[in-house]
Curated annotation (Swiss-Prot):
<feature type="region of interest" description="Disordered">
    <location>
        <begin position="59"/>
        <end position="82"/>
    </location>
</feature>
<dbReference type="GO" id="GO:0001661">
    <property type="term" value="P:conditioned taste aversion"/>
</dbReference>
<dbReference type="GO" id="GO:0007614">
    <property type="term" value="P:short-term memory"/>
</dbReference>
<feature type="region of interest" description="Disordered">
    <location>
        <begin position="275"/>
        <end position="353"/>
    </location>
</feature>
<dbReference type="GO" id="GO:0007612">
    <property type="term" value="P:learning"/>
</dbReference>
<comment type="similarity">
    <text>Belongs to the cyclic nucleotide phosphodiesterase family. PDE4 subfamily.</text>
</comment>
<keyword id="KW-0114">cAMP</keyword>
<feature type="region of interest" description="Disordered">
    <location>
        <begin position="626"/>
        <end position="655"/>
    </location>
</feature>
<dbReference type="InterPro" id="IPR023088">
    <property type="entry name" value="PDEase"/>
</dbReference>
<dbReference type="GO" id="GO:0008306">
    <property type="term" value="P:associative learning"/>
</dbReference>
<dbReference type="GO" id="GO:0008355">
    <property type="term" value="P:olfactory learning"/>
</dbReference>
<dbReference type="GO" id="GO:0046872">
    <property type="term" value="F:metal ion binding"/>
</dbReference>
<feature type="domain" description="PDEase">
    <location>
        <begin position="795"/>
        <end position="1124"/>
    </location>
</feature>
<dbReference type="InterPro" id="IPR036971">
    <property type="entry name" value="PDEase_catalytic_dom_sf"/>
</dbReference>
<keyword id="KW-0378">Hydrolase</keyword>
<feature type="binding site">
    <location>
        <position position="912"/>
    </location>
    <ligand>
        <name>a divalent metal cation 1</name>
    </ligand>
</feature>
<feature type="region of interest" description="Disordered">
    <location>
        <begin position="372"/>
        <end position="403"/>
    </location>
</feature>
Length: 1209
């Protein structure tokens, strides 16, 4: 039925074409121009003088009927005859754009991007050299000899006529590589032809290009190409043929109804091709050609001024396709040299409309470009209607077919997504752009200028009219109009870089990753010394780099606010671009390098210094016009090196305004760098600069927070005393309580009253310090697992099925951990840890006996204090499960070794063992044995480590017994570092270190976080476990609320102890004055959100859902805060202004505030002041004083302490 359909259609075409026969002449170069009265539909495209795929050759066209990349070769009859197929190639490369493939179909990934080619089913006999002049008689003899080899299909319907509609006609002659030796060396064929046609029959085989074009024309959605594969089409050939038949039926009528008496000019090949305009889909496909004919009219019928014999070799303007493999660079260089020689011969000929392919390869550059509506012409049009436009030429890299065979790989996806950005003409034009399958990972903008307003329709012959209509319709919805921008499309996958679209992977990182926030390389190496690590820039690496996108717009943490007292430009976002001249900005935008790292905000001081110094270097190059030295140690990926390459504008001369402004800004930038460097203390690392800055900014934020409401003071003190390291407290611009004489005297008096009581209330002295307190004697269950069968989930439980269902979701964030604790008979840590180690096969890789593992976990869980509301084994199980989920982050896949993963999970299991339910500050203030043993430094964290490693010495509990000594030492070091990092007083230092490391790598130009040493790797793991420890606010709201209730109950129990012992009640530990809702808002704003913001930035976009949940929970608690009045009047004692946080009335006193305010009003000038911590009783006392002197010191009632809660400030 298919052959019958072709026969019928061909017969109707031939009958119609026969009406328009005329006389024509050939110019002897295979590029004749007809003078008859017929109309050559499909345009006057010709390539290399070859009679290739064509449309309906108009009568009288002696060679102007070709519609694809070839030219019609009819001898004045308008009816082209089919010819035997041979194949030829002169150089093949990886990919080709649409016009290079005859018949209007997209090219496969292996098609040449610079040289026209033809499909195997459409290729006919071709003259040996398109540049040699042949007489018409010789051509006819050659055609007659080849016509004898054709069958009935060749006599009835021309393969080239079907080709215009994407048909797959042609014979089934067997091909071999030997057939290509004696043919032309200027017209390559696709690699698919060479592979598929050798010693096998081709029965109407469709090319990948035809399939891709048909899938686009039919509205099919193209899938992205898989990494490390070449792009191709995988659509059913039957479906494609059906789509093509529908296109043929739709196009027959407009083609046959076209008006005769017209011969199009063949001046500019692509400008004479008819298509539907995206802005006017109903336009007659011949109208544009008629308009162009009026512009390109020529009195000489035999010679067109725009026609050039060498124009047959015009190639598309795809960017050069270079291979990243070093062993084929020599072949590429030789081919590039040959192409440059050929290009020099074509400088005098008219050039096709410019097309800039922002990605490495296109697939259908010209056809898609010309389907994008209209392009404005310049103010002046050269003779013949040729538009003067900028042509972006690139050298071609053409590996041999032998090399290409190595790149042919199986695939599962259609052609890659393409975004084209045509550049406006010299006179100025508004260039429309077309987007095919673009996504959020691709940045697109078309360069546009201002100029003339006259418009002409750009035409194309690469795909059928119906396909053009579909393409333009879909592209118009994606990008209706062009928008000016300086950014170009950046490659979206490492696959393109590996295939040669960028060159080598190092250049890929330099041009792409620098506009991304952070990148984490997927490499493995030994933890201690980094041996065995593969370079992430190694092209053969399975995942040489992970591109992490810019974060979406969301509320930023306080780290990005101004710190104007200490730096000139706090955000340093545009530190480079803000001081550069306009000419230098244009230079930056024109060469596709990062513009001061795009939208990123650099907040760490050391990274800001690096960015400023880089800016100074760039400005110096711009001012002096000295090219960057090739011997410079600056890497190629440095943005400054590429910026200084070829200045597009005239060099700045001394005396110009731009020169003076740039010089002044450079001096200011250098002064700022010097000021920052002079303040660095030599005994501290550069990360301490960020830590001190963040602490300083947090103190500023907390000062405003404490003044915003009456409860803000207590929350501010809690955050300062818990999350700020006391070791560097002297660097903070805050006043300690001891510096206030009056408060010292008041505290001394109060201390004398309670000294005896406090001394008597101290706990009895513990065991000798040579022993580790809290370690119990081995329990009976240690050797209880004597049978051969161990419990499925590590614990014996009657509800094993329900437990197994929940444990099956251990890789899910926000698991029902409380239900796991219930179903596991209060053994959540044992079952969670055992299941995770089993699923990750860590018991096998680390050679841990399962029985030994269960013995140790059971013993460890017994050493968690069950009476603690929060710090118990359920919290340890929650942190372990959260750590497991974070380790499964796609961005970290394959980064850490099993030893590192096992160490992180082990540290999460033990990080709070034998926790007494008290804070480090309480142990220090009470002079506990633990504080004395560990010198007040991370008291509990050191204790957790000591207990855990001591339990490993119990019989049958050493889970690392089969490890080598070096591995055991490495794991112990890792676990110690990770557990010590869970000390909340190290929070700011940990956050600053991570942010400094990330931003420094980003500013340095590499954009790749190598993690090639122990320090960097353990830093990521420390932050990972720290995030898991502070993950409660990021869990679903019901879980979060339950954890908050448990934590506050533990705080209140500590406050009760402090009250009973006569100690100062720690912030947020007084159950009578605590404000839970507002404390959680402050906790999220100043602690949790900055941490998770940095982590989400590192692994973007994998943690976006977690960050969204955090913001939702914060909004919930913000909505639950009761309205709070502003602080009361001004303090009478000016000396009290020096105190950091003044304890004021709480929200619980709202009922008494009205009475207090009435007393203030009746008392005239009397004001209510509180010099020390006050409670509801003091408020009542002040109000009862009427207008006399209300608000004074009230006696203690109800056990409340009349003492300042400085919280370690």
């Amino acid at each position: 039925m298919m052959r019958l359909a072709r026969f019928t259609q061909g017969f109707s075409f031939n009958k119609n074409v026969a009406k328009h026969r005329g006389s024509g002449s050939s110019n002897g170069t295979g590029n004749g121009s007809g003078t008859g009265n017929g109309q050559g539909l499909g345009g006057s495209c010709s390539a290399n003088g070859l009679a290739a795929t064509g449309g309906v050759g108009g009568g009288g066209g002696s060679g102007s009927g070709g519609g694809g990349c070839g030219s019609g070769s009819g001898s004045g009859s308008g009816k082209r005859k089919s010819k035997a197929r041979t194949k030829c190639f002169g150089g093949t490369v990886f990919r080709c754009c649409l016009p290079c493939r005859g018949g209007g179909s997209a090219a496969p990934a292996t098609s040449p991007p610079q040289t026209p080619a033809q499909t195997p089913d459409e290729l006919k006999v071709i003259p040996e050299d398109c540049n040699l002049e042949k007489s018409a008689e010789q051509k006819r003899d050659l055609l007659e000899r080849n016509n004898k080899e054709d069958d009935l299909l060749n006599r009835t319907v021309s393969g080239s006529e079907l080709d215009l509609y994407g048909g797959a006609g042609g014979g089934t002659k067997k091909h071999s590589l030997a057939d290509t030796i004696d043919t032309s060396v200027t017209t390559p064929i696709s690699l698919k032809t060479l592979i598929n046609d050798v010693d096998e029959e081709l029965d109407q085989q469709l090319s990948a290009a035809d399939i891709a074009a048909a899938s686009l024309a039919s509205g099919l959605v193209a899938r992205r190409a898989e990494p490390e594969t070449l792009s191709d089409a995988s659509v059913s050939p039957t479906a494609v043929v059906q789509q093509q038949q529908q296109q043929q039926q739709q196009l027959q009528q407009p083609l046959l109804q076209s008006q005769p008496h017209f011969v199009p000019s063949s001046g500019n090949i692509l400008s004479q091709v008819t298509l539907y305009s995206g802005s006017n889909p109903s336009t007659n496909p011949c109208q544009s050609a008629v308009q162009n004919q009026g512009q390109n009219s020529n009195p000489n019928p035999n010679q067109n001024p725009n026609t050039n014999p060498n124009q047959n070799q015009q190639r598309c303007s795809c960017q050069p396709q270079t291979s990243p493999l070093p062993h084929i660079k020599e072949e590429e260089e030789s081919d590039q040299a040959n192409f440059k020689h050929q290009t020099s011969l074509k400088e005098h000929q008219p050039l096709p409309p410019p097309i800039t392919i922002a990605t490495g390869y296109c697939g259908s550059c010209e056809s898609v470009h010309h389907s994008s509506a209209t392009s404005s012409s310049a103010g002046t049009v050269p003779p013949g209607g040729q538009q003067t436009q900028e042509y972006i030429a690139g050298t071609s890299s053409t590996p041999s077919p032998r090399i290409k065979l190595k790149f042919r790989k199986p695939h599962k996806s259609c052609w890659s997504r393409i975004v084209l950005a045509p550049i406006g003409s010299a006179g100025g034009s508004s260039s429309a752009t077309t987007v095919i399958g673009s996504n959020s990972n691709e940045t697109l903008a078309s360069s546009s200028t201002t100029g003339g307003t006259a418009t002409t329709t750009q035409n194309s012959s690469s795909v059928s009219v119906a396909a053009h209509h579909r393409l333009t319709s879909s592209s118009a919805s994606a990008l209706a109009t062009s928008h000016p921008s300086n950014s170009q499309l950046l490659p979206t996958s490492k696959m393109q870089a590996e295939q040669g679209s960028i060159g080598d992977l190092q250049k890929y990182h330099s041009r792409y990753l620098k506009n991304r926030r952070h990148t984490l390389a997927n490499v493995r190496f030994d933890v201690e010394n980094g041996q065995g690590a593969r370079s992430p820039l190694e092209g053969g690496s399975p995942s040489a780099g992970l591109v992490l996108q810019n974060l979406p717009q969301r509320r930023e943490s306080f780290l990005y606010r101004s710190d104007s007292d200490f730096e000139m430009s706090p955000k340093s976002m545009s530190r480079n671009s803000s001081i550069a001249s306009e000419r230098f900005k244009e230079q930056e935008a024109s060469i596709l390098v990062d513009r001061s790292h795009g939208e990123d905000l650099i907040v760490t001081p050391f990274a800001q210094i690096l960015a400023s110094l880089r800016s100074v270097r760039n400005n110096l190059l711009s001012l002096t016009n000295v090219p960057a030295s090739n011997k410079s140690r600056r890497p190629n990926q440095s943005s400054s090196a590429s910026r200084s390459g070829n200045p597009p504008g005239a060099p700045l001369s001394q005396g110009e305004e731009a020169y003076t402004r740039l010089a002044t800004d450079t001096i200011e930038e250098l002064d700022w760098c010097l000021d920052q460097l002079e303040t660095i203390q030599t005994h501290r690392s550069v990360s301490d600069m960020a830590s001190l800055k963040f602490k300083r900014m947090l103190n500023k934020e907390l000062s405003h927070f404490s003044e915003s409401s009456r409860s803000g003071n207590q929350i501010s003190e809690y955050i300062c005393s818990t999350f700020l390291d006391k070791q560097q407290e002297f660097d903070l611009p805050s006043l300690r309580v001891e510096d206030n004489p009056e408060l010292v005297a008041a505290n001394a008096a109060a201390g004398q009253q309670s000294a005896g009581q406090y001394a008597r209330s101290r706990s009895p002295r513990g065991p000798p310090m040579s022993q580790i307190s809290g370690v119990k004697r081995p329990l009976s269950h240690t050797n209880s697992f004597t049978g051969e069968r161990l419990p499925t989930f590590g614990v014996e439980t009657p509800r094993e099925n329900e437990l197994g269902t929940l444990l099956g979701e251990l890789d899910t964030w926000g698991i029902q951990i409380f239900s796991i604790g219930e179903f596991s008979v209060n053994r959540p840590l044992t079952c969670v840890a055992y299941t995770i180690f089993q699923s990750r096969e860590l018991l096998t890789s680390l050679m841990i006996p399962p029985k030994t593992f269960l013995n140790f976990m059971s013993t460890l869980e017994d050493h968690y204090v069950k009476d603690n509301p929060f710090h118990n084994s359920l919290h340890a199980a929650d942190v372990t499960q959260s750590t497991n989920v974070l380790l499964n982050t796609p961005a970290l896949e394959g980064v850490f070794t099993p030893l590192e993963v096992g160490g992180a999970l082990f540290a999460a299991c033990i990080h709070d063992v034998d926790h007494p339910g008290l804070t480090n500050q309480f142990l220090v203030n009470s002079s506990s044995e633990l504080a004395l043993m560990y010198n007040d430094e991370s008291v509990l964290e050191n204790h957790h480590l000591a207990v855990a490693f001591k339990l490993l010495q119990n019989q049958g509990c050493d889970i690392f017994c089969n490890m080598q000594k070096k591995q055991r030492q490495t794991l112990r070091k890792m676990v110690i570092d990770i557990v010590l990092s869970t000390d909340m007083s190290k929070h700011m230092s940990l956050l600053a270190d991570l942010k400094t490391m990330v931003e420094t790598k980003k500013v340095a130009g590499s954009g790749v976080l190598l993690l090639d040493n122990y320090t960097d790797r353990i830093q990521v793991l420390e932050n990972l476990v720290h995030c898991a420890d502070l993950s409660n606010p990021t869990k679903p709201l019901p879980l979060y609320k339950r954890w908050v209730a448990l934590l506050m109950e533990e705080f209140f129990l500590q406050g009760d102890k402090e009250r009973e012992s006569g100690m100062d009640i720690s912030p947020m530990c007084d159950r009578h004055n605590a404000t839970i809702e507002k404390s959680q808002v402050g906790f999220i704003d100043y602690i949790v959100h900055p941490l998770w913001e940095t982590w989400a930035d590192l692994v973007h976009p994998d943690a976006q859902d977690i960050l969204d949940t955090l913001e939702e929970n914060r909004d919930y608690y913000q909505s639950m805060i009761p309205p709070s009045p502003p602080p009361s009047g001004v303090d009478e004692n000016p000396q009290e202004d020096r105190i950091r946080f003044q304890v004021t009335l709480e929200e619980s006193d709202q009922e008494n505030l009205a009475e207090l305010e009435e007393g203030d009003e009746s008392g005239g000038e009397s004001t209510t002041t509180g010099t020390t911590g006050t409670t509801a009783a003091s408020a009542l006392s002040g109000a009862g004083g009427g207008g006399g002197g209300g608000g004074g010191m009230a006696p203690r009632t109800g056990g409340c302490q009349n003492q300042p809660q400085h919280g370690g400030m």
